[in-house]
Amino acid sequence: MNPQIEERIQKIGERIKKEYRAERVILFGSYATGDATEDSDIDLFIVAPTKERFFQRMATVRRLIRDLRNGLPVAPIVLTAKELEKRRKAEDPFIEGVLATGIPL
């Protein structure tokens, strides 16, 4: 991964943890596997205490990191700890994949 992009991803993760009070921020997808291309987005799985509706959470995170993106597309998915646990118990293959292969930030 390009060192500048890697540094930017780390800063994005730090900001989300600090300002969105995220318990976990996990990089997944092509940037995590090393298969990213110029058309790839930065896939982030976020666990945070929030009462926002599902799609509002993503909008909030995008606004929060707007100045750090520098033109890079970011695709956040935000769940609460309770939602995550429910999906883990249901053996959701998406969640299992993110947790097994994602990179914690």
Feature map (PLM): residue ranges:
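Conserved H-loop
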Residues: 30
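Catalytic core of pol beta-like nucleotidyltransferases
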Residues: 1-24, 33-38, 48-105
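Short beta-strand->loop micro-motif that forms the acidic, two-metal-ion catalytic signature
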Residues: 43-47
